[in-house]
Amino acid sequence: MKEQITIYYDKDKKHPNDYIIKRVITPDGDKYSIMSYYKIFGMVKRFHSKIELSNVAVNKYILQCMKSQFFNRVEYQKVMEGI
């Protein structure tokens, strides 16, 4: 089992076909990586960020995301690792 942090966003009513769905922050050793999921023209696309964050930077990043007008919630989850 590995831990991950998921930040969910509400749908943008002005642009219902183009909006961010969620960001998933996963630990990779002592750094964290970010995977973003967007809905673009009705299709879900996944983008892996090349940015590696420290523990303190992750906390600041979550606080920054919470300031978004489309922010919904943050979930701390334990998920099974890929087989």
Regions found by a protein language model. Name each.
Residues 1-33:
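Short N-terminal "domain-start" leader segments
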Residues 12, 24, 37-40, 56:
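Generic structural motif
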Residues 29-43:
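Short aromatic-glycine-(Arg/Gly/Cys) micro-motifs in beta-strand/loop hairpins
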Residues 42-83:
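Mixed-charge, Lys/Arg-enriched low-complexity segments
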